[in-house]
């Protein structure tokens, strides 16, 4: 199902219709948290388990799921190999399993994650539980791989176990008729971007691959009178949340961002998505461009190119797969950075500051990110660029002091403290993880008011408060090994590098279509295994072809006109049959004669014509 196609409904509605807990497996912690908050806001019991919450909280969530107090349980794929989770799972009444971003299980996909291969172990534990795999971007090869890796057909519901059971593959069309796809080659991308933003009214997203460039580009646009801000994974979580809300609420027109922005963003009226740099694959481009026009109204997806893009694209392929010796060096530096010795570190989840790491060990962030991805695919670690860590609170006054008038507590402060004490029992002894959305609902506060109230209590030295934040983390999935023994398999490096090149070639093909090329919608649909019966008629290729055809027709019409005028230029009457000797069709000649008569350039007497 394409981006914005309503994937959540496909499992939420059927799961609500039956008893039991629905387990949703997703790699996107930020999206996981947003989904949980949305469900809770409408009164549906939902929880998420990830590395940003305490062990005690995880145990509490799992116990609640066992006793029926949780309807939707969101977990990361790494959680499926956790002993505590598997032990508790045995006692749950699981009614449904949903695999989101299912393309991550396929090595043919653009975002392969080895942890997804563990999902099949869950199927062996719960063989009769229905399983739904969802993705917005899957080629036919990826779809085939998903059905094989998840062994659809081998695990049939008990009531039809005696019959052959085949997987049902449902696919919505990838065609987005309301989106006009455009590739534009220009000398100055900044100038062209500003021109496009002024010509298309409404909200826009501008994607660029460089964090520094987001800030520079946003500043340039603001100087030109355009209302913009910027967003990337390196920003403080509070700033990211604020800017996201400003953009969604219409206070900001243009969001300049890296691809860290967009997952889980549900804004229907985005009129324009512009890419300043070419994405790595058509899957990525289609997903990001598809954030435009979810309301069905006319929208635009524009890719800006210049003469240097092909060279930089080729260089990017090399950067995505740095030499194995470099990957080993990054691994060593990570272990030094976290003070992890040989044969230790398994299971450790540690906060990772990319900028500090790169400065300390003289690396470039893009190279480190590529190395981390390879180490993750080789199953040495898990890198989460945005790990959602819940807010934490500890009361630092004695219980009897809470009623002391000297504290001058406001109504909101008193109400919030009472609510906290009602639901959390460790506030006086530990920094306790709290659920912001749940408490806001109980206190009838907005999130901003809730945050302001806790900050006020912190300033009065009543509590210690650490706001919710999204921080990068690295989890070591095995003990540290000597880098000489670090193995990066062929399937992780050479094979994936080859598939990366193949996807890049398709993206270059998309960029390269000219007036004689393939309709962009047709090319995209063909890539995803879908046939378009006729060209879209709206992309820049189709429009250029239509203009060229019109110009050609006008040119040909002028040639016929000149040939007729030359024949009649002697001023003598000519029989109409002589015109056939000019070599043009009867329709073209008839149309030309009618034009000349309308212009009063010739007269006709029966079958004879004379130039006036």
Kindly give the residue locations of the regions a language model identified.
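Secondary-structure transition/turn motif
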Residues: 4, 611-612
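Short leucine-rich amphipathic alpha-helices used at interfaces
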Residues: 8-9, 427
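Helicase motor core with emphasis on the C-terminal RecA-like subdomain
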Residues: 2-8, 14-23, 30-404, 411
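Intrinsic-disorder/low-complexity peptide segments enriched for small residues
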Residues: 26-29, 609
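C-terminal accessory/connector segments of nucleic-acid motor ATPases
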Residues: 323-592, 599-604, 610-611
């Amino acid at each position: 199902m394409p981006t914005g196609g309503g994937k959540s409904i496909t499992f939420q509605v059927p799961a609500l219709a039956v008893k039991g807990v629905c387990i949703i497996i997703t790699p996107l912690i930020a999206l996981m948290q947003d989904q949980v908050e949305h469900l809770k806001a409408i009164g549906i019991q939902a929880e998420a388990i990830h590395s940003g919450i305490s062990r005690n909280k995880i145990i509490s969530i799992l116990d609640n799921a066992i006793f029926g107090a949780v309807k939707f349980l969101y977990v990361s794929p790494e959680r499926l190999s956790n002993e505590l989770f598997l032990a508790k799972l045995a006692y749950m009444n699981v009614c449904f399993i949903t695999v989101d971003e299912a393309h991550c299980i396929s090595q043919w996909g653009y975002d392969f994650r080895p942890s997804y291969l563990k999902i099949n172990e869950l199927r062996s534990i719960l063989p009769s539980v229905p399983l739904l795999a969802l993705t917005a971007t899957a080629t036919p090869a990826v779809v085939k791989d998903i059905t094989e890796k998840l062994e659809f057909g081998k695990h049939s519901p008990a009531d039809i176990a005696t019959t052959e059971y085949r997987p049902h593959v449902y696919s919505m069309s990838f065609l987005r008729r309301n989106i006009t796809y455009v590739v534009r080659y220009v000398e100055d991308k900044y100038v062209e971007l500003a021109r496009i933003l002024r010509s298309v009214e409404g909200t826009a997203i501008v994607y660029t691959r460089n964090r520094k460039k987001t800030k520079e580009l946003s500043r340039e646009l603001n100087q030109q009178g355009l209302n913009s801000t910027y967003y990337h994974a390196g920003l403080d979580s509070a700033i990211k949340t604020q800017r996201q809300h400003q953009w969604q609420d219409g206070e900001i027109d243009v969001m300049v961002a890296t691809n860290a922005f967009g997952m889980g963003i549900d804004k229907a009226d985005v009129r324009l998505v512009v890419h300043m740099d070419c994405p790595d694959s058509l899957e990525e481009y289609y997903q990001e461009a598809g954030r435009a026009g979810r309301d069905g109204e006319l929208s635009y997806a524009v890719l800006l190119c210049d003469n240097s893009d092909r060279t930089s694209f080729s260089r990017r392929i090399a950067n995505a797969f740095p030499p194995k010796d470099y990957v080993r060096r990054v691994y060593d530096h990570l272990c030094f950075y976290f003070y992890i010795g040989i044969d230790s570190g398994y299971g450790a989840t540690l906060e990772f500051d990319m900028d500090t790491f790169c400065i300390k060990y003289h690396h470039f962030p893009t190279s480190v990110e590529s190395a981390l991805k390879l180490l993750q695919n080789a199953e040495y670690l898990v890198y989460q660029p945005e790990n959602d860590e819940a807010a934490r609170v500890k009361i630092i006054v004695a219980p009897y002091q809470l009623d002391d008038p000297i504290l001058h507590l406001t109504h909101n402060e008193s109400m919030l403290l009472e609510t906290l004490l009602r639901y959390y029992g460790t506030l006086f002894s530990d920094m306790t993880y709290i659920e912001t959305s749940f408490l806001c609902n109980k206190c009838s506060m907005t999130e901003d008011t809730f945050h302001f109230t806790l900050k006020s209590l912190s300033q009065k030295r009543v509590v210690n408060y650490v706001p919710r934040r999204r921080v990068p983390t690295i989890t070591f999935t095995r003990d540290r090994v000597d880098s000489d023994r670090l193995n990066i398999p062929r399937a992780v490096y050479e094979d994936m590098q080859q598939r990366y090149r193949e996807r890049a070639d398709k993206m270059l093909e998309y960029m390269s279509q000219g007036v004689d090329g393939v309709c962009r919608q047709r090319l995209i649909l063909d890539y995803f295994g879908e046939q378009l019966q006729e060209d879209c008629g709206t992309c820049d290729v189709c429009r250029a072809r239509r203009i060229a055809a019109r110009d050609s027709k006008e040119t040909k019409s002028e040639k016929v006109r000149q040939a007729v005028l030359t024949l009649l230029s002697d001023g003598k009457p000519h029989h109409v049959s002589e015109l056939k000797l000019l070599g043009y069709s009867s329709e073209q000649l008839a149309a030309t004669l009618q034009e000349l008569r309308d212009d009063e350039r010739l007269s006709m007497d029966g079958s004879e014509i004379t130039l006036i």
